[in-house]
C-alpha cells in the first residue's frame, strides 16, 4: 500500500471512515493540453509524485522504464507514469487521452492528459468535453504557439471557463521573470478574442524539477502567487447546470415487474422533487412525480448530476431519448440548428451529407445544409469554405429528420452536445455543440429532399467534370 495513503487511512480512523471522508470531498475534472513536448505528461507525473500518490511497485517500475524509455538522462522520467501506450513510450509523445485519479486532503481530482500533436486534436476535444478546468502548458523557450491557441479555443468552445496557463521549463530560461511576463502578455492579448467570461491564471513552473508544482520554488522569489496544486485545490467551480431549468433525458425504461415502471437517467440540470408537475417532450403529455428512486432508497428531491429513476403518477408513453422538464416551461421542439463542429474524420464534412447523430440518449439523423464558416485557429478569424476537413472547427447548419428538444451548449452541455456517426461504418466522425436552435418559424424550407441533396454532393465530389451546380450554393 502507498505509505501516504496508509497514513491518511490511519488519520481518519480506518478504511470505512476514510472512504466516507472521500465521498464528501469535492471533485475537480481538469485536462492538460498544449503544444508537442511542452511537458504535459511530466507535469501530471510530478503532481502524482509530489502528492505521494505513487505505489512503491510503481516507483520501482518507473526506475526501470526510465532507463529503457526515458528522455531525461539519469533522472526519473515522470511522463512514463502517464504515457501508457507502447507507441507513446517509444516516440516520447502522448497519442491517446490518458486519465488519472488522485486526491489531497482538500479535493479529489480526475486528470485527462491530452495529446499535443495537431493530428490528435480530436482526442483533445474528447478529453475536454467532461472537464471544468484546463491547464495550458507553454514552453518558456517557445512562447505561445498555434497549438496553444487551438487548445485554448477548443477548451472555451466546450464550455471550460477556468484556464490555468502553466509556463513550464522555467529552469531552461534561468527562471527569468522577464520571460514569464512577456509570455503572459502575449497570451492575454490572444485571450481577448476568446468567447465568454474567462478566469485565467498564470503559474511559472518546472515540472521536471518540481518548482511551483506542489511546493513553492526557491528559484523564483519574484513570484508570490500560489503553486499549481494550490490553484487546483482552491479554484471555485460554478456549475452552470445547477442554475438551469430542469432537464431529465430518459436513458431507459426500468420495469423489473408488473408493479413498477420507472424512467432512469441522470438529471442533466436543475432539480426535481416529489409532487412536481412535469412535461414529456416531444409528446407534451404532463404528469406528476410520484417517487424519486436512487440506489440507496427513495428521495424527496434530486439535483443535477445525480443518477435517479423517476416514477410518475400516470401510465404514459415514454421511451429512451424523451425529455422530462417542468410543466410550466415552454421549450419548443426544433428541426434545425446551427452547430459548432469539431470534425474528426479523414473524409471532410460537406453540405448535402447525412449522418446519424446522438444527443442526450436520443439517436436520429441529420442533414448538413451548409457550412457558414471555418475558424482559423491562429487568429480566430472566420473564412468561407466548401467543406470542413479533419480537425477543422466551424459553424454548420443542420436539419434533423424529426423534431428535437435542444438547448444551447453553453447553457446545458447534455441537451446541447451531440456526436456525428457515419451511417456505414458506425464510427464517430465529429462532435457538435449547439450554437443556436432554429425555431420552425425562422427555418428556411428546402426545395430539395435529403436524397436529392446527398446525390448532388456525391456527383460533385466524384464527377466534377460534369459541372453539376451546388443545390445549396445560395446558402
Swiss-Prot record:
Region (G1): 34-41
The organism's place on the tree of life at top rank: Bacteria
Sequence similarity: Belongs to the TRAFAC class translation factor GTPase superfamily. Classic translation factor GTPase family. CysN/NodQ subfamily.
GO terms of molecular function: ATP binding; GTP binding; GTPase activity; sulfate adenylyltransferase (ATP) activity
Region (G4): 168-171
Residue ranges of the region described as G3: 113-116
Domain tr-type G: from-to ranges: 25-239
Classification via InterPro entries: CysN_GTP-bd (IPR041757), CysN_II (IPR044138), CysN_NoDQ_III (IPR044139), G_TR_CS (IPR031157), GTP-eEF1A_C (IPR054696), P-loop_NTPase (IPR027417), Small_GTP-bd (IPR005225), SO4_adenylTrfase_lsu (IPR011779)
GO biological process, one term: hydrogen sulfide biosynthetic process
Keywords: ATP-binding, GTP-binding, Nucleotide-binding, Nucleotidyltransferase, Transferase
Chain sites annotated for binding GTP: 34-41, 113-117, 168-171
SUBUNIT field: Heterodimer composed of CysD, the smaller subunit, and CysN.
Reaction(s) catalysed by this chain's protein: sulfate + ATP + H(+) = adenosine 5'-phosphosulfate + diphosphate
Protein name: Sulfate adenylyltransferase subunit 1
Region G5, annotated ranges: 206-208
Role played: With CysD forms the ATP sulfurylase (ATPS) that catalyzes the adenylation of sulfate producing adenosine 5'-phosphosulfate (APS) and diphosphate, the first enzymatic step in sulfur assimilation pathway. APS synthesis involves the formation of a high-energy phosphoric-sulfuric acid anhydride bond driven by GTP hydrolysis by CysN coupled to ATP hydrolysis by CysD.
Pathway: Sulfur metabolism; hydrogen sulfide biosynthesis; sulfite from sulfate: step 1/3
EC id: 2.7.7.4
Claim: Heme is one of the keywords in the record: no
Renumbered residue ranges of the record's region G2: 92-96
Amino acid at each position: 500500500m502507498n505509505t501516504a495513503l496508509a497514513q491518511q487511512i490511519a488519520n481518519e480512523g480506518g478504511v470505512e471512515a476514510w472512504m466516507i471522508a472521500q465521498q464528501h470531498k469535492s471533485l475537480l475534472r481538469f485536462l492538460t493540453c498544449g503544444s508537442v513536448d511542452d511537458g504535459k505528461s511530466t507535469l501530471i507525473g510530478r503532481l502524482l509524485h509530489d502528492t505521494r500518490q505513487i505505489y512503491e511497485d510503481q516507483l520501482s517500475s518507473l526506475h526501470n522504464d526510465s532507463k529503457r524509455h526515458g528522455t531525461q538522462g539519469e533522472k526519473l522520467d515522470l511522463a512514463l507514469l502517464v504515457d501508457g501506450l507502447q507507441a507513446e513510450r517509444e516516440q516520447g509523445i502522448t497519442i491517446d487521452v490518458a486519465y488519472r485519479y488522485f486526491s489531497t486532503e482538500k479535493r479529489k481530482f480526475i486528470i485527462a492528459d491530452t495529446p499535443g500533436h495537431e493530428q490528435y486534436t480530436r482526442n483533445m476535444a474528447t478529453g475536454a468535453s467532461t472537464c471544468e478546468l484546463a491547464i495550458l502548458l507553454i514552453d518558456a523557450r517557445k512562447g505561445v504557439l498555434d497549438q496553444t491557441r487551438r487548445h485554448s479555443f477548443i477548451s472555451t468552445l466546450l464550455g471550460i471557463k477556468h484556464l490555468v496557463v502553466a509556463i513550464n521549463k522555467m529552469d531552461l530560461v534561468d527562471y527569468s521573470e522577464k520571460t514569464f511576463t512577456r509570455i503572459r502578455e502575449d497570451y492575454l492579448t490572444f485571450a481577448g478574442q476568446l468567447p465568454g467570461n474567462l478566469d485565467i491564471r498564470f503559474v511559472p513552473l518546472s515540472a521536471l524539477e518540481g518548482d511551483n508544482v506542489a511546493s513553492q520554488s526557491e528559484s523564483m522569489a519574484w513570484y508570490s502567487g500560489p503553486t499549481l496544486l494550490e490553484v487546483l485545490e482552491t479554484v471555485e467551480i460554478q456549475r452552470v447546470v445547477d442554475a438551469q431549468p430542469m432537464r431529465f433525458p430518459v436513458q431507459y425504461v426500468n420495469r423489473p415487474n408488473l408493479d413498477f415502471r420507472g424512467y432512469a437517467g441522470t438529471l442533466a440540470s436543475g432539480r426535481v422533487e416529489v409532487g412536481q408537475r412535469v412535461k414529456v417532450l416531444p409528446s407534451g403529455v404532463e404528469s406528476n412525480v410520484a417517487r424519486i428512486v436512487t440506489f440507496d432508497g427513495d428521495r424527496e428531491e434530486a439535483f443535477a448530476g445525480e443518477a435517479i429513476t423517476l416514477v410518475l403518477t400516470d401510465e404514459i408513453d415514454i421511451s429512451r431519448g424523451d425529455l422530462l422538464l417542468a410543466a410550466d416551461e415552454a421549450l419548443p421542439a426544433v428541426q434545425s440548428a446551427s452547430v459548432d463542429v469539431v470534425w474528426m474524420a479523414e473524409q471532410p464534412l460537406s453540405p448535402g451529407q447525412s449522418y446519424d447523430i446522438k444527443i442526450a440518449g436520443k439517436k436520429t439523423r441529420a442533414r448538413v445544409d451548409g457550412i457558414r464558416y471555418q475558424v482559423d485557429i491562429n487568429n480566430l478569424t472566420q473564412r468561407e469554405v466548401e467543406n470542413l476537413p479533419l480537425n477543422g472547427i466551424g459553424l454548420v447548419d443542420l436539419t434533423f429528420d424529426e423534431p428535437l428538444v435542444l438547448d444551447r451548449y453553453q447553457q446545458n452541455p447534455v441537451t446541447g452536445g451531440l456526436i456525428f456517426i457515419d451511417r456505414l461504418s458506425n464510427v464517430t466522425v465529429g462532435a457538435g455543440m449547439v450554437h443556436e436552435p432554429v425555431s420552425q418559424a425562422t427555418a428556411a424550407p428546402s426545395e430539395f429532399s435529403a436524397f436529392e441533396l446527398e446525390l448532388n454532393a456525391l456527383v460533385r465530389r466524384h464527377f466534377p467534370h460534369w459541372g453539376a451546380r451546388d443545390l445549396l450554393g445560395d446558402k
